[in-house]
Amino acid sequence: MSLRLRVLLVLLFLLLFVGAPLAPAPAHAQSAETAAVITELKPGRGRVEVKAAGGDWKPARPLLALRAGDMVRASDDAKTAVLLSGGRGTMRIEGPNGVFTVPAAAAAGQGQRARALVEASLGFLAGTTRESSQAVLATRSATRPPIIVSPRNGRVLPEPLAFEWLGSRFSHYTVRLVGPAGPVVDRREVTGARWSYPADAPPLTAGTRYTLQVVAGSQPAQEAWFEVVDAERAREVASDLAGLEQELGPAVSPTSRAVLRAGLLAREGFLHDARRVVVAGLAADRDEPTLHQLLGDIYTRTGLTDLAAESFDEASYLLSK
């Protein structure tokens, strides 16, 4: 792991777990390190519950931070995955009688870097998702304009870009990409709500803000901007993700791996790329509430309150069915 990555992770750890003025933590959370996080949660016909030392059993929730001594149990066919800090992998707890007590985090040393990496990537989302799920109040409409979903007002990695908006796969749209000097690409009669940047189009310049415009019929044009980062920054992000993968090891499930990758990307401001990771995770694990919760969190950050509400509703449904 590079020195730059180690410094970044330590700083993130301090910001997230010492100075972040986000959702208030329980009393025992304020005086103890995070030793694990719930990254997968499927109640099925049973229940997944957690109990802090000296506390009562309570329903578990996605991305719940756990401390040493906390207990997790699963009944009937319920199951959950708990990611341990310090590069210690995951524990799977399954019903009907699965019980697990969270062990203490590893001592400082070689494990310290892994602990900072895991807690930085997950802790950022874990601290805000609870606020988001309670704060979203959206008015859903049967007829939606082609609101741009992604990328939406943020930085993106210089990979093949695909733009998405709210719409029908049978409808036709006008898609226009505008740069500082004027239109870069103008396409009419684009079918469906997804458009990939053409390989033969002019290359996008790093550090330049572009605006995507999508028009459906006589409705007003919908706009969102994005900025492609330069090659050096992209290499740094790729190195961070590779370091994350190395610390997780092969035993961590694809779903938990997606949660960690999305958390790290979102913490660095790459919400478009974080969303791609979550959407890919959902394609393989559609019934995982944690992924829907993360997707709702990303939509909240980008101002898409209707989509956030739908994602949070789906997470709640999967936890209660």
Question: What feature does the model see in each segment?
Answer:
Residues 29-166, 224, 236-241, 260, ...:
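Flexible, surface-exposed loop/linker segments and immediately adjacent secondary-structure boundaries
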Residues 102, 131-251:
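Long, contiguous interaction/recruitment modules in multidomain scaffold/adaptor proteins
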